[in-house]
């Protein structure tokens, strides 16, 4: 599986141009992308990290990291996904960085999703949806999610970079992913959720034994 993740990471490097500021996501496939990026770090201007973990990895490779607030234009954002379909709709946030990932993705002109073939699905929903919640609202949000048909589980001992907690939600209805994304976000106490149906991936680079294909 690592070999496929490396393939996908290498394929994304082809989209990096000189003097670019690059948005960098979070997760195991992105970690391989950071290694590949380190080899051309002299060509790029800097990176915007979607998590403290990613920032630490970038800095460890000697890659400059800048704050999103100092950026007006972000040409490209590279990130993985827990699930992705052929339309570029995704479930993300298994690592808990979904809020910052969604923010950086929305700033970026182009979102390149890098995955191995196991992450490609016809219909989203096997993987649970991470929902970032203000701690005091945990029980209330969980009750509201149950009303939506979901089964929330508290991610014990996990605190997001924003100081919040995560509810992992199973068995949600993905017949209309965009409506689901909205339905979760309007619950008071919800910061963000891991359904990416509004900000789609512009390119989905899928690595398999036979090579890397662009799903979109």
UniProtKB/Swiss-Prot annotation:
- The entry's substrate-binding residues are 26-29, 79-82, 92-95, 119
SUPFAM superfamilies noted in UniProt: D-ribose-5-phosphate isomerase (RpiA), lid domain, NagB/RpiA/CoA transferase-like
Q: Which UniProt keywords apply?
A: Isomerase
* Keyword Disulfide bond assigned: no
EC main group? isomerase
Q: GO annotations under biological process? A: D-ribose metabolic process; pentose-phosphate shunt, non-oxidative branch
Catalysis: reaction(s):
aldehydo-D-ribose 5-phosphate = D-ribulose 5-phosphate
Q: Name one GO molecular function term.
A: ribose-5-phosphate isomerase activity
Gene3D superfamilies to which the protein is assigned, alphabetical? 3.30.70.260, 3.40.50.1360
Q: Does the keyword Isomerase apply?
A: yes
Q: Where does the chain cross the membrane?
A: none
Give the record's family classification. Belongs to the ribose 5-phosphate isomerase family.
Name the record gives this protein: Ribose-5-phosphate isomerase A
User: Organism, per UniProt?
Assistant: Legionella pneumophila (strain Paris)
């Amino acid at each position: 599986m690592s070999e496929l993740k490396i393939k996908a990471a290498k394929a994304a490097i082809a989209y990096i141009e000189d003097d670019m500021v690059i948005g960098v996501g979070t997760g195991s496939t992105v970690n391989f992308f950071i290694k590949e990026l380190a080899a051309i770090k002299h060509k790029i201007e800097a990176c915007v990290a979607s998590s403290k973990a990613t920032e630490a990895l970038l800095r460890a490779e000697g890659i400059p990291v800048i704050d999103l607030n100092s950026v007006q234009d972000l040409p490209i954002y590279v990130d993985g996904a827990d699930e992705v379909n052929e339309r570029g709709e995704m479930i993300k946030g298994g690592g808990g960085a979904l809020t910052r990932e969604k923010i950086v993705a929305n700033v970026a002109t182009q979102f390149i999703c890098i995955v191995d073939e196991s992450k490609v699905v016809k219909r989203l929903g096997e993987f649970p949806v991470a929902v970032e919640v203000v701690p005091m609202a945990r029980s209330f949000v969980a009750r509201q999610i149950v009303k939506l048909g979901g089964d929330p589980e508290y991610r014990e001992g996990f605190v997001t970079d924003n100081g919040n907690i995560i509810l992992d939600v199973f068995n949600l209805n993905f017949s209309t992913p965009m409506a689901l994304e909205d339905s979760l976000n309007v619950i008071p106490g919800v910061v963000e959720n891991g359904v990416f149906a509004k900000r789609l991936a512009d390119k989905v680079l899928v690595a398999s034994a036979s090579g890397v294909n662009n799903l979109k």
